Amino acid sequence: MEHCYKQRFYGIPTHRCLQMTPTLGHCTQSCVFCWRATPETLGIGWEQTQPIKGGDDPDMIVEGAIAAHQKLIYGFGGNPKVTETYLKEALNPIHVAISLEGEPTLYKHLSDLIRSFKSHGFHTVFIVTNGTDPEALRNLGTEPSQLYVSLCAPDENTYESTCRPMINGAWAKVMETLELLKSFNCPTVIRHTLVPKLNMGNINSYAELVKRANPTYIEPKGAMSVGFARKRFAYNEMASYEEILAFGKKLAEETGYKIIDEQYESNIVLLSRLEKPINLYA
């Protein structure tokens, strides 16, 4: 059976994965490749860069996310390709990716949210951040199971044109976050979301930034022209798997990391300083 790269790489049973966000509509960047609806693409505006005042209770968020997840997939019970056992497991998620939309560090109870997911029986909690709030990461009282930082530019000029930050000094904040990664005990990942016409050049500079962060893994991945991203770059402008693999090989040469896995269907390559990835579900 086909499954997400998180299962192939890290042992996560991805039919039991819940994706969610505590910061709907709030982000400090407006990335060209983002599939979400942004104020720009909707032609309306709202304040989306400031931390959410107050914020919902973490337990309420977790319980609401589980209920929404169950409602979303319950109809698969009528699909002859889905077994009763598989559906029953899927209705009981045990992995969460806090990454669906928005910037999670704008939710000021992020540590409590991690703890709440774990207290509700979740085995693994992934967080994906754009790195523009190093202070929030520095103050995390509870670490996730794995921390991702999206680094989608090799230099400040490319960052400005590709990630389109909406706060002052964003590039410097991302650089500060890279320096912070070495202080985390959990596995860390640098994610490069790539589009040939935008941000696939200057691999040497990508390599220098990776060396500063010394992450456990690097994930070069092709951006997808889906959702609202279709308004910003076309399907035929997406990176091919061959281009992503070539990028990964060059990055491996420059960093000393090794390509330890890949998944064609997800258009992604996994590099690491380890010989093999850590199985987070074993």
Regions found by a protein language model. Give the residues of each.
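Accessory C-terminal segments flanking Radical SAM cores
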Residues: M1, I12, R16-Q19, S225-A229, ...
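N-terminal [4Fe-4S]-dependent radical SAM core
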Residues: M1-L24, T38-I61, A65-T85, E89-A90
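Short Gly/Ser/Thr- and Asp/Glu-enriched loop/turn motifs at secondary-structure junctions
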Residues: H15, L91-P93, Q263-N267
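Short cysteine clusters
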Residues: M20, C27, C31-C34
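Surface-exposed beta-strand-to-loop junctions
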Residues: V32, A37-W46, M224-A229
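Conserved AdoMet/S-adenosylmethionine-binding subsite of the radical SAM
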Residues: G78-Y235, A239-E242
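C-terminal accessory regions of radical SAM enzymes
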Residues: K211, E242-A282
